[in-house]
UniProtKB/Swiss-Prot annotation:
Its main location: mitochondrion. GO terms for cellular component: mitochondrion. Pfam families: CIA30 (PF08547). The keyword Mitochondrion applies. Chaperone protein involved in the assembly of the mitochondrial NADH:ubiquinone oxidoreductase complex (complex I). Belongs to the CIA30 family. It is found in: Mitochondrion. This is Probable complex I intermediate-associated protein 30. It comes from Arabidopsis thaliana. InterPro entries: Galactose-bd-like_sf (IPR008979), NADH-UbQ_OxRdtase-assoc_prot30 (IPR013857), NDUFAF1 (IPR039131). Keywords: Chaperone, Mitochondrion. Signal peptide: none annotated.
Length: 227
């Protein structure tokens, strides 16, 4: 074989290899585990917050209960929502009755480029919870918050395991829990963290609302590519 034909064949082979590499490398798996809640080590990646930090009386916990029957362990986010305020509180908050769990800061980012939805496997109490995604700002500037927050409601059916699938397009930009009217696009390649929260005001029509106890079991959180 001449040197020219050898070079041509090598070029063709390299092109075929590059095309194969592109297909395999650029299309992400159908699903991607983000967080799981199967051990106490898994729960150490999260911290709790509530209105008690601002004079409220709500409380929350995140635990792995010992089932004792050999079944798989799952995290339980539970507590009590109160719309009352501590007597003599120095804080002037407009509303109380909320609790949440947020992933702790970590080095790097969660890359959700190529995915269409967030999925949570949960078993709840009939309340509506709030799923939040925190992303890095597209452009950071002085005086600007270090991240953007995007929120969507997720219903937790009572006493039944349910996989909630929330398209990323359904997450709306928010500021301090309120939807803001601004044209923004999520930066899915630079996710800084996530949270799950609940408030006494409820959410979806027909969902349980008001002050009182709440409880939701969480198995895992994944990113999905939808068909």
């Amino acid at each position: 074989m001449s040197r020219f034909r050898s070079l041509l064949q090598a070029s063709v082979n390299a092109t075929k290899k590059a095309l194969t590499w592109n297909v395999e490398e650029w299309v992400p798996p159908a699903e991607k585990h983000i967080f799981k809640f199967h051990s106490k080590e898994d729960l150490k990646k999260w911290h709790l917050y509530s209105d008690s930090e601002y004079g409220g009386l709500s409380s929350a916990s995140l635990e792995i209960p010992d089932k004792g029957d050999g079944s798989d362990c799952t995290g339980v986010f539970s507590g009590n929502l109160s719309v009352d305020l501590s007597e003599g509180s120095k804080w002037n908050i407009s509303r109380s009755g909320f609790c949440g769990m947020r992933s702790k800061k970590f080095d790097g980012f969660i890359d959700l480029d190529g995915y269409d939805a967030i999925a949570l496997r949960i078993r709840g109490d009939g309340r509506c919870y709030i799923s939040t995604i925190y992303t890095e700002n597209w452009v950071n500037s002085p005086g600007q918050s270090e991240d953007n927050s995007w929120q969507a409601f997720v219903f937790a059916p009572k006493d039944s395991w349910y996989t909630a699938k929330i398209p990323l397009a359904r997450y709306l930009p928010t500021w301090r829990g309120n939807v803001i009217d601004v044209e923004m696009e999520m930066n899915p390649g630079r996710v800084l963290g996530m949270s799950l929260s609940v408030n006494a005001e409820g959410g979806a029509v027909g969902a349980k609302s008001g002050a009182g106890d709440f409880r939701v079991e969480i198995d895992w959180i994944k990113a999905l590519r939808l068909p």
